[in-house]
């Protein structure tokens, strides 16, 4: 695959996916590493290892299945580690990573997770995806409050190109935003130093208490808040892939790289939706090219390690938010359409959508999981009670 020979919108979809992933949560990983007492150099090494791991896994799975399979670090898992690693050492942290990733591999080997994912109705998966992405759409238009000129210009460029050259609409918005930001002096490039920092091996230290209090919650949060939405997102986008091999591969890769700071590698949901949308490629069978491009950008991000985080800080937050919202707009509308198509499933889908969009967190598990649970309960109750009335 030659990156330069791919359609520009396809390549840019991969770039936007990686950009959104790093911009939205890289800082949380830095905080988690700091909680374990990591130095700036060690943190940069973590970022390098994570970028390379995501690049390898994304490219391998995408090329193997010829489907847009994007991997990511677990953002909810990183948030959990910010508090869970307080007062612990780096060897303690690595021991926690190994236990959590081993549990993910075990979940894939047994096939339990795959069986659970097969029973989720398509309408609920689509509703959950729409609920996950809703905040990105709201954030995008919320940026007009503080950055009307830049974000308004991005929106106008997107609208114009959506009419005359739809595949280049997101690119036009990106260029417009950067142009305005540079003109306004809001891009601080002076503090960025591009250099590669390689990760160092940290021998693990295992503790039953730490495994129970941190590793098991990390495993549960990663599966419920990241892998479940990620698999459901693929399902909602029309890609039916075997789930257990995905869990085994990502879990094993993270397990092997745990001593270098890779606390988790899981199936992406939000960023994957960018590569699975019609904007990435009009032909669904060719959208894997966008994910492959994202894999290459992951490797580049990993090569430069901590410098990527500095770049994210240099770009205006509102630019990233507007770009993400516009890139996900077609996916949001498509997911809502799929969720509400069947009248008999509509109420349950709305429940799943609203619970997911609410941001509800219970027992450290995010709203995407609870959206599926609430929607599933609604689906079971409502479809059962409506069958007699329909037949009568």
Listing of model-derived features with the role each one plays in the protein:
Residues 1-44, 171-243, 391-392:
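Helix-loop-helix hairpins and the membrane-proximal interhelical loops
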Residues 29-33, 57, 78-82, 138, ...:
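Predominant activation on well-ordered alpha-helical scaffold segments within soluble catalytic domains
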């Amino acid at each position: 695959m030659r990156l330069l020979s791919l359609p520009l919108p396809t390549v840019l979809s991969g770039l936007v996916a990686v950009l959104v992933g790093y911009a939205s949560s890289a800082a949380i990983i830095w905080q988690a590493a700091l909680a374990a007492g990591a130095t700036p150099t060690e943190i940069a090494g973590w970022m390098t290892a994570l970028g390379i791991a995501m690049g390898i896994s994304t490219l391998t799975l995408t090329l193997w299945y010829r489907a847009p399979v994007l991997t990511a670090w677990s953002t909810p898992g990183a948030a959990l580690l910010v508090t869970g690693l307080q007062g612990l050492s780096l060897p303690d942290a690595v021991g926690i990573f190994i236990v959590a990733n081993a549990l993910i591999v075990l979940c894939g080997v047994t096939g339990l997770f795959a069986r659970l994912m097969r029973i989720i109705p398509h309408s609920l998966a689509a509703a959950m995806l729409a609920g996950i992405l809703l905040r990105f759409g709201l954030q995008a238009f919320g940026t007009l409050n503080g950055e009307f000129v830049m974000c308004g210009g991005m929106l106008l460029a997107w609208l114009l190109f959506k009419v005359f050259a739809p595949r280049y609409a997101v690119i036009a918005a990106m260029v417009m935003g950067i142009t305005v930001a540079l003109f306004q002096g809001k891009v601080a490039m002076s503090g960025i130093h591009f250099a590669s920092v390689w990760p160092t091996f940290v021998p693990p230290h295992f503790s039953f208490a730490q495994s129970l209090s941190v590793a098991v919650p990390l495993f549960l949060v990663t599966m419920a808040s990241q892998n479940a939405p990620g698999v459901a997102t693929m399902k909602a986008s029309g890609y039916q892939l075997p789930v257990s091999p995905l869990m085994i591969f990502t879990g094993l890769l993270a397990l092997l790289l745990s001593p270098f700071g890779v606390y988790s590698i899981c199936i992406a949901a939000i960023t994957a939706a960018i590569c699975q949308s019609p904007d990435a490629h009009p032909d669904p069978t060719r959208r894997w090219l966008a994910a492959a491009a994202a894999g290459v950008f992951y490797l580049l991000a990993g090569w430069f390690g901590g410098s990527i985080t500095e770049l994210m800080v240099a770009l205006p937050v509102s630019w990233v938010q507007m770009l993400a919202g516009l890139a996900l707009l077609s996916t949001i509308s498509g997911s809502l359409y799929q969720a509400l198509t069947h009248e008999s499933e509509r109420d349950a889908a709305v429940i799943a959508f609203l619970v997911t969009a609410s941001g509800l967190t219970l027992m450290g598990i995010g709203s995407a999981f609870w959206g599926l649970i609430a929607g599933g309960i609604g689906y079971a109750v409502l479809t059962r009670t409506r069958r007699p009335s329909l037949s009568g």
